């Protein structure tokens, strides 16, 4: 299983560095390959890691194209998301049930305490899908959707609900996806969301593990 993300420069702030390094350490225990869009960072480097030089806020289409090339399940995850080993089993169960895609709400934690993490919003920082479904995303996602824009997840949820409604799973109950409580947010606010047939179908999957 592959993970694809876009990281911020660790020099941006100590908080950004801490959160992304913590996430990267958790990914090494779960994923076979780790692919970052952005300049190389020594502290995010391991034998599993590759970097693709990219502009800030890379297009979702570019990341989906990369996800489509692995011949396996690939996950798009925000760079500060900690994952548990349970994600391996959750995605395996999705596959066994004929699933093609999955998402999860995030459990917010403070300091290093994952045990007491709680769902505090409906933010989505994780999507997993088969490589062939990512290929469809790459062809259809509008070019204005980029990492850092709060509506790209709306589009992607709607797309999966539309093209794979019986193969799209909510794995929230498996408690695999953790998000650190933090400030210092950086968003591409200048991008205007434009509704289409997919954004109008946004919603969590009907199927749940």
Q: What would you call each of these model-derived segments?
A:
Residues 7-16, 36-76, 82-86:
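Active-site-proximal specificity loops/subdomain of glycosyltransferases
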Residues 31-40, 100-104:
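Short, hydrophobic beta-strand segments that form beta-sheet elements in well-ordered domains
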Residues 1-5, 27, 33-36:
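Hydrophobic targeting segments
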Residues 31, 70-71, 98-99, 164:
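Short, well-ordered alpha-helix to beta-strand connector turns
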Residues 17-33:
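Short, acidic, metal-binding catalytic loop of nucleotide-sugar glycosyltransferases
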Residues 1-16, 23, 143-209:
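C-terminal catalytic/acceptor-binding lobe
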Residues 67, 81-158:
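Conserved catalytic core of nucleotide-sugar-dependent glycosyltransferases
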Residues 8-10, 40-43, 80-82, 107-109, ...:
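Short, solvent-exposed loop/turn segments at secondary-structure junctions
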């Amino acid at each position: 299983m592959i993970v694809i993300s876009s990281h911020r420069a660790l020099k941006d702030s100590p908080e950004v560095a801490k959160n992304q390094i913590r996430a990267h350490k958790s990914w090494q225990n779960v994923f076979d390959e780790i692919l970052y869009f952005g300049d190389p960072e020594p502290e995010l480097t391991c034998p599993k890691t590759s970097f693709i030089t990219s502009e800030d806020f890379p297009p979702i289409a570019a990341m989906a194209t990369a996800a489509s090339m692995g011949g396996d399940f690939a996950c798009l995850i925000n760079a500060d998301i900690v994952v548990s080993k349970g994600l391996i089993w959750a995605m395996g169960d999705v596959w066994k049930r004929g699933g093609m895609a999955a998402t999860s709400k995030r459990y917010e934690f403070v300091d290093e305490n994952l045990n007491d993490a709680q769902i505090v919003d409906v933010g989505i920082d994780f999507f997993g899908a088969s490589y062939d479904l990512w290929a469809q995303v790459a062809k259809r996602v509008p070019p204005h959707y980029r990492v850092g824009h709060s509506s790209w997840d709306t589009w992607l949820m709607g797309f999966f609900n539309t093209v794979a409604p019986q193969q799209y799973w909510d794995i929230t109950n498996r408690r695999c996806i953790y998000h650190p409580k933090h400030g210092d947010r950086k968003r591409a606010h200048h991008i205007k969301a434009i509704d289409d047939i997919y954004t109008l179908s946004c919603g969590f999957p009907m199927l749940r593990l």
